Amino acid sequence: MPGHPGAAEQLVKTGWRSWHLGFWKALAPLQAAWDAFSQPVPASCGQLLTQLLLCASLAAAAAGLVYHWLASLLLYPPGPSAMVATVCGLLVFLSLGLVPPVRCLFALSVPTLGMEQGRRLLLSYSTATLAIAVVPNVLANVGAAGQVLRCVTEGSLESLLNTTHQLHAASRALGPTGQAGSRGLTFEAQDNGSAFYLHMLRVTQQVLEDFSGLESLARAAALGTQRVVTGLFMLGLLVESAWYLHCYLTDLRFDNIYATQQLTQRLAQAQATHLLAPPPTWLLQAAQLRLSQEELLSCLLRLGLLALLLVATAVAVATDHVAFLLAQATVDWAQKLPTVPITLTVKYDVAYTVLGFIPFLFNQLAPESPFLSVHSSYQWELRLTSARCPLLPARRPRAAAPLAAGALQLLAGSTVLLEAYARRLRHAIAASFFTAQEARRVRHLHARLQRRHDRHQGQQLPLGDPSCVPTPRPACKPPAWIDYRLDALRTESSEGEGKELWSCRDLSCNLGPVPPPCVTLGKSLHLSEPRFLHLHNDSIFTIDVTYFPRRDVVRMEGNTGHDRPG
């Protein structure tokens, strides 16, 4: 049906209008709360209650964040952490409620988090989190591999000593019988085998203790570094916010590059909207979401540096996983080492013959008479790992810490893109707290735009040939670029006193009659300009200007200091 598309479009427009109206209605209480918060002195009891409620909420939130930061992240004891958080909350409430610049400073610290100082804080916290999680884990896995080496060494030494002991026992079991005949069995075991075993045990134990101490030292160093760096960056955050507020209040040129609504209204009232046609490149639209080319280029460069940090984080995480896999493979190999059973059987038979040569003469075997028969069996196990040496399991990498570090780095990367908006928000916050200062800054920006427009207009004037029509009159009029407002400075002087205000001289000696002055470039001079602020109403001011258009000299002389007649 033909009516359906129009009805659907009308329905969409109505829905969009309703959503937009509802959105602004929802923002109205927030705007009222912000107006009350940014007022130096509340105008009503409602604003006072709103201001106190906001200050109390911010103080409670600050106390909770401080406690979580101290107790959970920096691992301080709960008791001192709660005490410090309570004191911080009380100080924040009193400062916000009684000192308006502190409220502005507190509000400025929020967009400052989205700038370079906040990015440093996020990156330092990310690095510390990654170091606390990865470095001890890598050292623990190296320690597990070292424990495998210790257990294998200890087990091999035990097996060697046990084998030596069994062989020594077998040689002793033979006793004096081993000395029968001309041959004997001699087996000698050194008595310092236990000392060697203890020495190797101490060496391996020392290596493991060194690894354990290194792991504890790395954990403590990372935690201490995180505490110090976080504290320094938080202090730097407050200092940077205070520096911005100081420069905003003392320097009219500082961060005064935004085309705000106040500037637009002032230009409209002064009928000077042409000053923004076209706007200068350095002037940023405060309410516009589009970034300038300079801002985009700066964002790309900083994102490149953050990409290098992400690569370093990925390398650290990969190192952690490789160390875990190697330690796990080593521990599994040690656990699967077989136990080798060894059985030593000693069989010793002694027999004798009497007149054995007689049967030998008849090519017969001599009968043997058994004299001694010894049968001994010795069994033990050859273990490559010691039963008294427990194997340490490989420590699996924690996924939460690298993910948190990566999230913080991505958040820091987002602050690169949001830094331009954070600067605009910071300017808007300071302007809402100090409206009189913002009005002075708007007037200064208006004057700057006016000067830029005047320079631009002066550069656009043509510099062609002067058009002079010779006329035989003895005097010449003032140049056209002298503003008509200088007529008020002219004075009728008495005869013989002073000089004529305007005089023209033809110094080229070849043009015949004196032409009128020809000016191709100039500007109007106003008494409101800074170079004329020293003049008083009781003085006559004349201008002495020399201009040379193509060797034709026009000279205008001026006198000052003559009293006004009457």
From Swiss-Prot:
Its main location: membrane. It is a multi-pass membrane protein. Residues 1-51, 103-128, 249-304, 420-566 are cytoplasmic. This is Osteoclast stimulatory transmembrane protein. It is found in: Membrane. Probable cell surface receptor that plays a role in cellular fusion and cell differentiation. Cooperates with DCSTAMP in modulating cell-cell fusion in both osteoclasts and foreign body giant cells (FBGCs). Involved in osteoclast bone resorption. Promotes osteoclast differentiation and may play a role in the multinucleated osteoclast maturation. Residues 73-81, 150-227, 326-398 are extracellular. Keywords: Differentiation, Membrane, Transmembrane, Transmembrane helix. InterPro entries: CSR-E3_Ligase_Protein (IPR051856), DC_STAMP-like (IPR012858). Pfam families: DC_STAMP. The chain crosses the membrane at residues 52-72, 82-102, 129-149, 228-248, 305-325, 399-419. The keyword Transmembrane applies. GO terms for biological process: cellular response to estrogen stimulus; cellular response to tumor necrosis factor; multinuclear osteoclast differentiation; positive regulation of macrophage fusion; positive regulation of osteoclast differentiation; positive regulation of osteoclast proliferation. GO terms for cellular component: membrane. It comes from the Eukaryota. The gene is OCSTAMP.
